[in-house]
Amino acid sequence: MRERLAWIALSVAAAAFPGRIGRASPMEDPSAGSAVFSGPTSPHPTSIFINPAALLFSRPGFHLHIGGALRLDQIGIDRKVVDPESGELADGPSVSTTTMSPTGGIAVWRSVLQERAVFGAMLHTPVIERFIADQDALRYHVLGGTMYQGMLSAAGGFKVADWFIFGLGVSLGYSGLHLEMARDTALEAGSGPERGIASDCGGSPCGIENPLASETITVDVASGGGAEGGFLSKLGGPFEDFTSNVGATLSVAIKVKGDWWGALSYVSPPGALPGRSLELKERGTVQIEEAPRDGGEFHRGRAQVRTRMPQSVWLGLRGPVLPGWDLVTSARWLNLSRHQQFELRMYGGDLEEIGVPEWYPRYRGMRDVVQLTGGLEGQDVGRTRFGGRLRLETGATSAVNVAPMQIEGWNAAATGGVDLQLHQHWVMNLGYDLTWFLPVGVDASAFDPLDRLACVDSSYDFDECRAAREGRAIPTAAGDYSRLRHTFMLSIRYDSL
């Protein structure tokens, strides 16, 4: 009876899951593989997504897991601005802010076939990125928003032999992007006196980043044609979108020697079905607030965003080194170089009449990330067990590509956690992760407003407009960046045996 109620609870949670929710690596749930007691060799519920083979390491019987995390990012930015006449950098405004990103999941799994197989399902949020909000000094890069993906994953692990386990998982995710930003209408009209930086803004030349020439853009898109409502309500979207949101996980676990196990898994991006482009397409609406010099009126139209999500490969090794303690190590490659931009298109309504560009890419410039993790964890015996890990990760953005929307340099982390048995069948987990990002000073930024002037003033010469095509010809992202992240994790688990 308990099992039936748990499966019903999972289904109800899926139907009620909100379409917009609340980042180790960018766009990533911190509890998926990086937290204590999780990873490619751990029987954590996130193994349903990252390594189903590891589910065979869990206790026999039925399991229900409900958990969440709260991530706080402390961010400091000392901006620099560009003089349009000399091209030199000068000190600009400073920003100190905190972003808060909640995430969560619910999972069930059960051993069957005399404990030779395990099947499970999980509703979770593997992709999370909350942007800096309400900072006018950063408005031409970001004014707020969230990138998210809610996912329903199902998987099985199969013990083919006592030394070999095979795992297979399938995931259906629906993604969304809510993005607020500004567009410098004077800069994007070039150097001329009619609409460009030499035109009038309150009795003086507009120049670059003049508030009177600032147009505000709010994009709200989602896969499934931008359907609103709960998670399951989006399943009515076009079949093209359905197949573009299906991913797969393949994994193996091999006994190396004695109680030492190694694991290898591959997690595909959305669109893993044969013949798919692996490109995520989201549709929805856009709202434009005209620049004050143009009247400040509101206009609405349609929006579409295309982007490419990363794939990942996990490698893990686990085994006893001290009585009651296991050494846990892992390495992960995240193929973020696929994620170069948000390809934004805005159309419909009267957007063309008021001069809103139909194609307006936003540059991201990510690169592949390698993560190395190692630590000690207590074995799953007794009423209490502790664990701790250290983590090192290469940066997803090089210094030139760092911007307020992507402060993703090299980082190091320490994480710890504890399992507390509250009752014969109930276990509570508490965890904390502290991640320090290497401070970055950016002088030669990939984002340069002078590239926009060169593009427009050349009558849109192909070579002169490369930065504009990539979404980099906007006010500079030069400056000094710092970031410190705190992640608090809490979960409760029911074990039938």
Regions found by a protein language model. Give the residues of each.
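Bacterial N-terminal signal peptides
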Residues: 7-16
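Positively charged n-region of N-terminal signal peptides that target proteins for export
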Residues: 1-4
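Outer-membrane beta-barrel porins/channels
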Residues: 21-38, 43, 103-497
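N-terminal, post-signal peptide beta-strand-biased segments of exported outer-membrane/organellar beta-barrel
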Residues: 17-125
